[in-house]
């Protein structure tokens, strides 16, 4: 049984999933990005399984190489966007912790407490 066309199709599907994940990260749709991750992982596992079953020819490897490059580029961009988001969340958690400390320290004194404001635009 020739699995080469199926392997090529699986790679095309992985490219589509990779592009979807990049779009979701670019649009800051974090919940949807996380939800799409399992389909991406399953597609990678399917490709690994198919690649074990057949030994792709040199020609096939040359055809797959641009797709692999695109997937790796997309993955790198998604990781960069996720790192930016993680940094934003860490900053928010830090601000929340400071606000909680201020409220805890001065909250029982009956006066007004001025907490730091969020200056994000």
From Swiss-Prot:
Described purpose of this protein according to its UniProt entry: Dual-function protein that regulates the transcription of class 2 flagellar operons and that also acts as an export chaperone for the filament-capping protein FliD. As a transcriptional regulator, acts as an anti-FlhDC factor; it directly binds FlhC, thus inhibiting the binding of the FlhC/FlhD complex to class 2 promoters, resulting in decreased expression of class 2 flagellar operons. As a chaperone, effects FliD transition to the membrane by preventing its premature polymerization, and by directing it to the export apparatus.
Gene3D superfamilies referenced in this protein's UniProt entry, alphabetically: Flagellar protein flit
Gene name for this UniProt entry: fliT
Signal peptide residue numbers: none
Subunit-level organization: Homodimer. Interacts with FliD and FlhC.
A GO biological-process term: protein folding
Name of one Pfam family that matches: FliT
Keywords: Bacterial flagellum biogenesis, Chaperone, Cytoplasm, Repressor, Transcription, Transcription regulation
Chain positions covered by the region annotation FliD binding: 60-98
Family: Belongs to the FliT family.
Cellular compartments per GO CC: cytosol
Keyword Membrane assigned: no
Keyword Repressor: yes
NCBIfam families recorded: PRK10548.1 (NF007836)
Region listing for Required for homodimerization, in residue ranges: 1-50
Location of the protein in the cell: Cytoplasm, Cytosol
Protein name listed in UniProt: Flagellar protein FliT
């Amino acid at each position: 049984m020739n699995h080469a066309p199926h392997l090529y199709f699986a790679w095309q599907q992985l490219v589509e999933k990779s592009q979807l994940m990049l779009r979701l990260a670019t649009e800051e749709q974090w919940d949807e990005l996380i939800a799409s991750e399992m389909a991406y992982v399953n597609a990678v596992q399917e490709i690994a399984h198919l690649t074990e079953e057949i030994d792709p020819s040199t020609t096939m490897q040359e055809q797959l190489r641009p797709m692999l490059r695109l997937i790796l580029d997309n993955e790198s961009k998604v990781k960069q966007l996720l790192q930016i988001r993680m940094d934003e969340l860490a900053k928010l958690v830090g601000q929340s912790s400071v606000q909680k400390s201020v409220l805890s320290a001065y909250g029982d004194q009956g006066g007004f407490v001025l907490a730091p404001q969020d200056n994000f635009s």
